[in-house]
Each structure stands twice: as C-alpha cells, then as structure tokens.
Amino acid sequence: MEVGFKALLDDLDVLEKSLSDPALINKLRSHVENLATLSKCNPHRRSKVKELSSEVVDSNPYSRLMALQRMGIVDNYERIREFSVAIVGIGGVGSVAAEMLTRCGIGRLLLYDYDTVELANMNRLFFRPDQVGMTKTDAAVQTLAEINPDVVLESFTMNITTVQGFETFTSSLTNKSFCPSKEGGSGVDLVLSCVDNYEARMAVNQACNELRQTWMESGVSEDAVSGHIQLLVPGETACFACAPPLVVASGIDERTLKREGVCAASLPTTMGVVAGLLVQNSLKFLLNFGEVSPYLGYNSLKDFFPTMKMRPNPQCSNVACLERQKEYMLAKPERDAAAKAKMEADASTTIDEGPLHDDNEWNISVVDDENEKDTTKAASSSDTLPEGLTRELPVADEYEKAIAIASGSGETEEEDDLEDLKKQLEALNAA
Amino acid sequence: MEGWDPNTKSTLTRIPLLTTKAGPRDGAAWTQRLKEEYKSLIAYTQMNKSNDNDWFRISASNPEGTRWTGKCWYVHNLLKYEFDLQFDIPITYPATAPELELPEIDGKTQKMYRGGKICLTVHFKPLWAKNCPRFGIAHALCLGLAPWLAAEIPILVDSGAIKHKDDAATSAES
C-alpha cells in the first residue's frame, strides 16, 4: 500500500511539471500525503489462517476456540469454517451477533440492512461514533474484516420487504458458491432474524418457508427489559405466521395500545444478552453440542428464562408453511423407522445382558405394548387434543365460508379490465 | 373501531372491501387483487370529490402495481399543505400493510421512520391485521394516512418544522 502511495506521488511530480497550473496538483498531492499518513496509522491486518490449530501460543487466534474440542464439548470445531450464516438486520442484536460469529471463526456471513449508523445508536454495542453516516452494512464489514480476516463477508444494503429486495434476498440465500459440495438446496446453514419490525419478520418467514430454510428469530421488547429467541424449522415448528398477531387473537381494543412518539427504548445489556443467547443457540445447532432451545425467553426484571415448544398451526395463513407441514407429515414413516432402528439397537444392547433370573417359576412375562402405541399414534395423527386441553382460538371454517361467498360474487368482476380501471383512476386524478 | 369519529366510520363503510388474498408474486390472483384495489380507490376518490373533501392523488408508477406515487394535502388554518406520497407494496402484502412515505417531512418529526415512513403501528396496523385481506390501499389512506396528517401537520406547522410555500417564498425574498 505504501509503495502504491509513493508511486502516486511520483506520478504527481511528473504531472506538475507538464501542467501550467500547479494549484490542483498541489491539492491532489496533499490529499495523497494525507492518505499515506492515515495508512501508516492503521495497524496491519494479520494474514489469513489456512488451518485451525490448537497450539497454545499468543499469536494463535483460535487456540481458545479449539480448546472446546480438547475439553470434549465439541467434536470437531474446525467445521465452523464450512458454515454460512445470514443475519437480517444489523442493529442492536444483529451487529453483536455478527461480531460474535466472526470471533468464533464462522466461514461466511451474509449481512442485510438498509439503515445508516447514527449517534442515537451509540447506546448499544458494536458501532462507533466515527462510523456515523455510513450504512450499517458497510460499517459492519469494515469492523468485522479487521477482527477476523478469515471470515468471508457479503453485505446487502437493501430492504427485503420490497419485491426487488425479496428476490435479491432469496437468491443470495440459495447461492452455493461458498461451499458447492454441500448437499441440500440452500446456500446457507442458518438465517438469523434480528429485525425490529413485524413486516421484515414476515418477509424472512416467507422466504424461509419457501426455501425450507431453518432460521432463528429474535426480539427485544419495546421497554428494553425482556427479549426472546426462537428456532423455526419449516413444517416442524410453528412459523412466524402460524399464530395470529396478538391484537387479532386476543380481541384487544387497539385503542389500548398507546405509545407516545415512535422511539422504542433500548439497552445495550438486554440487546447483548439476546444476541448472546441467539449465537449460543446457533453454535449448538451448527456444531451439535448441548441442547438447542426451540424457544428461550429472557425477562431481566426477574431473571426468568422461560422455554417452550410451539407446533405449527394446521390452518396457518401461510401457504408455504402448509406445504412444509405436509412434507413433514409425509416423511413421518422414515422418521419412525429411524427411531425404531435406534430403539432396536438399544434393545439388542439390553438383550445381551440376558434375563435377570435363571428360572421363572410363575411364568411371568412382560407384554409388548405396541398396540397401545399404535392407538396413540392414530389419535395424534387425527389432531385430537390430549385430555384436559381445549383450543384457545376458533377454527378457520367460518372465515373460509365468508371468503367463498365473496369470491362467488367476485366472478362477475372478472370481466372488468385492469387497464380500464387504471384509466378511470387517472381520469379522476386529473379532475 | 369504537374510538373513530362518525365521519370516518360512515366513509369507511362505503369504501368497497376486497376479497382476493394475493401478493405481488401471485400472477393472475394479483391482477384480480389490483382490479379490486382500483375499484376501491375509484369509489373512495369519487366519494371525496362529491363531499368536497378531496385530499389525495395516487396511482401505480409501474406496470406490476408494486410501486405507487401521488400527492396528499391537508388544509390547516385555511392554508393547503401538499406533500409527495409514495409507497411500495411489501412482498407479504396483504398480510402486512404498505409503509406510507412522505419523504419531504423525513427527519422533521419523531412520528416517522427513516425515509419518511409514517408511524402507523398504534392506530392503523392492528386494524389492518384484523381486517386482512379485506382492507386495501384505499383503507390504508383513509384510516392510516388521513388521521396521521390530521394529528401531525398542525403540530409541525405550529412548531415551524413545516412552512407553507407562500411563507417560504416570503422569507426567501426578505
């Protein structure tokens, strides 16, 4: 880099002699000298590491990560380099999650955001005041590349809720140039949703349902004292549209949803905790250690961490979700066979031990309850609820009937032409 | 809807509801939805004109019908304040409402997100969620944008954040 600057200065000298007006050249020269000075101030970035090493020396950036392998937590930590993770929303949670994954040595990060850094963001971690005015994606790449040059960084400055943005989003998720040999249709191993609004979450939900992409959703409350993370496997767990919005489900009067101004509260602490929970769950999912939580909440006022599992809604309003649920049901025999094989393996181990008693004077025998299991399966497949439970939300039949009636009358409108209607509106606009 | 004023309620009941649940990528169904949107907008515009309450112009700026632009205005103290209006149809429409934008007011009020997107989270989006897919663009304008203008423009004018073009011209001359 310095050699380049020196060459530039030499070129400027030659130019200065050949031109009559040296003012512009002098201006350019001072600019280049300033850049050269800046480049000297910048610390040199370390060279890339080709293979992870567990050698314990100060200069090995991965020594403490590979120790997880030595201590038996992770079988093969080096696999981290094969994974691609997409992070939607580089805000208070997403930027911290991106930094955590970068420091863990993730193979590739895809970053999506359309916002810019402002001083109002300084209440949270990651971005710095000198980055104010930059797009969040550019600022994030700048910082993360310095932290760990081994990570492949791809940034997309765009709004994924628009038609064009959504297409770019889905095509980038299916791009497999990073690891072509990997099986499956997706180019990323996990999508992390770190957005702060309903519309963007619905867009991520739509994309992942269509692509059969596993993703994790995160959220922080408006009062900044609680948050949650959630694992979403299309077809297997509830998607983001499976449960209707609270205001619809509960019948809450929208007048009670009061809010002064627009600005939600936020704390770097709550954001940092949620980012930590999200990345920890992601690492467990990717590297296969510990137990991956389907849902994990965080209530900081009481230090309460609720967990739960949410099944998909058979009447979900999202068509792609219904398709994934059907696929999941069709694959049930395979999963049952796999579970049975595992059980047989365990049983064979048990059988090796042999009977506990050599004699059986009273001819007592343990009867296999397979028939009972079949009955249970039949019950569960028919969506019958366990005893004592009732459905909280009404079924959607009434709604569908209403739609059918309306669409019946809609057939008459089929004859109308779109262009005619457009012209009518334009005429009204002109009047 | 209990908290809304009688005028808005009566206006709303006469804006045609939509029946096709389709988004921009749904082909023929989206075309059908667009037809219903146009009928709804035509009816609402005609109603406004006949009531001498005309306050907006809107039309699709691309053939797919995913980008809409126009103008809206609000009369305060006998002065007409006019603004550019624009929005994109989101990919998950009609499950999610369009984000209405007034780019000229961007940064001048806290009731707004970056790019001039007006905040509808409290007074409109819950209604939209309850009435999906029956509500459309006309309903977003009637229940979302109109109340926002009525609530915010007087405050912005009184605080000096917005100046009428005549006032602006006067101050420029002086």
UniProtKB/Swiss-Prot annotation, chain A:
Where, in this chain's numbering, is Zn(2+) bound? C239, C242, C316, C321
Provide the active-site residues from the annotation: C263
Q: Which residues form a coiled coil?
A: none
Q: Molecular function terms in GO for this entry?
A: ATP binding; metal ion binding; ubiquitin-like modifier activating enzyme activity
The residues listed in the UniProt record as binding ATP, with positions renumbered to this chain, are G92, D113, K136, N159, N197
Residues of the region (Disordered) are 339-396
Which keywords fit this entry according to its UniProt record?
ATP-binding, Metal-binding, Nucleotide-binding, Ubl conjugation pathway, Zinc
Q: What is the top-level taxon of the source organism?
A: Eukaryota
Give the signal sequence positions: none
Xref: Pfam families? ThiF (PF00899)
Function recorded in the entry:
E1-like enzyme which activates UFM1.
Family matches, as PANTHER family? UBIQUITIN-ACTIVATING ENZYME E1, UBIQUITIN-LIKE MODIFIER-ACTIVATING ENZYME 5
Q: In which family does this protein belong, per the annotation?
A: Belongs to the ubiquitin-activating E1 family. UBA5 subfamily.
Q: What is this protein called?
A: Ubiquitin-like modifier-activating enzyme 5
UniProtKB/Swiss-Prot annotation, chain B:
Catalytic site positions: C119 (glycyl thioester intermediate)
Q: Supply the InterPro entries for this chain.
A: UBQ-conjugating_enzyme/RWD, Ufc1
Q: Which chain regions cross the lipid bilayer? A: none
Q: Which GO terms describe its molecular function?
A: UFM1 conjugating enzyme activity
- Give the intrachain disulfide bonds: none
What are the entry keywords? Ubl conjugation pathway
Q: Which domain of life is it from?
A: Eukaryota
Q: Please cite one Gene Ontology biological process associated with this protein.
A: protein ufmylation
- Which family does the UniProt entry place this protein in? Belongs to the ubiquitin-conjugating enzyme family. UFC1 subfamily.
This chain's function reads: E2-like enzyme which forms an intermediate with UFM1 via a thioester linkage.
Protein name, UniProt field: Ubiquitin-fold modifier-conjugating enzyme 1
Originating organism: Arabidopsis thaliana
